[in-house]
Amino acid sequence: MAPTDVSRHTLSVLVEDVEGILSRVTGMFSRRGYSIISLVSAQTENPGINRLTIVVDASETIMEQVTKQLNKIVPVIKIVELEADATVARALMMVKVAANNTNRPQVVDAVNIFRARVVDVAQESVVVEATGAPGKLAALLDVLKPFGVLELVQSGDVALGRGPKALAPPRN
C-alpha cells in the first residue's frame, strides 16, 4: 500500500451498551495492526445504545476490512463512514497557558478571537477551553504556543452527518 492511498476516515458506530464492547472494538483494530487516531464513546439519545466515533488513517481497502470485521462483533448495530463534506465534527481542547499580569490581556484577546473561553485563572496561568473543528483548535494552539503551553488535553472528534437523516431511527 503506497502512502498516498492513506486518508482520514471517520466511522460512526452504533453499539449496544454491553460490558466489554469497547475492548472488543479496540481489540479488533489492535489484532490487525490498525491504528486509531481518536476514539470517542458516548451514550446516544436511545438508552442502552452508545455511539463510537472512530477516526483512522487508512486506505480504502483497509476501511473495507475494518467495516467487515466490526460488523462481525455481535453488539454492533450499525456502521456508517461519515464523509467530510457531509459531516459536522467537533473536538474539545483545554490548554493551560503561562499568563501573568503583563501578558494575560494578550492571551485573553487571542482566546476571544477564536470564540474560546478562559475557564480558570491562576496567578501565573490560565486554562482555556475551546471546541471546534480540528483546524480551528490547531490554529488556536499555534497562537497560544508563544505564551508558553504548560499542559494540553484534547478529546477526539465527535461527529454527526448533516441534514435530517439519522444513523438510527429514534425509539418511541
State the predicted function of each range:
Residues 1-50, 55-172:
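Long, contiguous binding/interaction regions
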